């Protein structure tokens, strides 16, 4: 029995494109068709069929009922838009004939299926008619079979990190729901089993009795939980076959490592989902009266989408993650490749994760790491050079503000390079006090600080360095207190700027350009020539000596005070790897330095060779 299906409305079909009676034969090909041949009857049959008029076409056959059912099923199974039918050749002898034709079915999504076939004809009481058989629609179509169109979605592309390994790959999540009607009298037992079994995975189900009442009050299934493949393997044997439990596999892109930059990977997934599905393949199959596939009549393979690459580097990310995991509180590290702007790592410990992606969006006073900006501005304005002798008293009064050094240390008069390496607040407070209100704001922009970068796949905020007319505020801004704010992402850009000689445009997803709200003027060569050796001196003979064993590291430490505590900062670079490390409320900068040291020590020995 062929499944009945009505053809599409007549208006949705294109009329017969061409019906060409090429040749007729009475044992001889190439002769002019005889007037009483089967060609005219075949033309009428194809003409009706091509516009979806299956009833008329069926009446031109010797078995109208069976033909109509088969033709309706063919149109429905192919979901066809229209059909072009072309007669290639007509042959007949006495009361039998054969029409050789070419069908072009126009299918959804601009697909076409073209094939040649043969239609048997017979003359009955002087009138030619179609001798109906299923193989008249297609040479390989058997009796009581029809067509079905199958889509073969390509395997979704994966998302890779910079080293080539997958960070997101196609898989399934399993949606569990409860259908009270299907559960019937077993509803209470099913609900109690569901609450007990799913308790390790969700606390949202609550009281079994209330859940049963909720499920009974609606005709729709009630959501229970969404499980990963591994969790489904644990739950399904106990729950999957109970009355009323419905388990629906849902395709998804799944993290290959739940501990690999989870917040970043979640943002990447949202950004790239529309790029991961390639061109679907499709097949036309013959199916029997039970809907079971019998044979493939036509197949077009799909083309998968190319994989998407993100700039996170597994080696760097894992090293940074290991480093932040050694600290309590809220610790984070951002690593950027100065030569390209590629974001190599965004690592946070569990304490930081509670507040979202603090590493790229959290704003904090940067403390003395901001002295990279202040020193650069002073050099660019010809206020000082690394060798200029400047005062580093234990405290200094500027306007109505008294500025102390950490612990009140006093170096007297020293070269600016020494004041930078020892992190003299008083030195840089005095320098900033002599700058114009927009001096530090303009200087910060040269390092990307305060610039808005629309990085595809991740939300970023660099920082804020507002102009300051008030002398006391400008003084505090000079050593990273006051109203100056920066994210670890922003300070990593500052360090990357010194390393590269220009501010790199950050990027996370390969092939997705970053929009920048303004062009940052480059830092000058004299700024670079001064800042680089001063940042190296911080490591060799200053506040970051503890990381001196990790190769040629350049950096600037910072401890930013806030009421009741201080933040621990360290920013810098080594080779083509710039970083910023922050421990919120972590106290002395030595802790951020130690955390950064753990990161470098966790990299392969030859990584920065």
Segments and roles (model prediction):
Residues 137-153, 167-188, 192, 282-370, ...:
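Short pre-catalytic segments that frame enzyme active sites
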Residues 34-40, 51-100:
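Short solvent-exposed beta->alpha transition segments
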Residues 110-149, 249:
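Short beta-strand edge/turn micro-motifs at domain boundaries
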Residues 32, 92-95, 211-243, 247-264, ...:
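Conserved SxxK-family serine transpeptidase/carboxypeptidase catalytic domain
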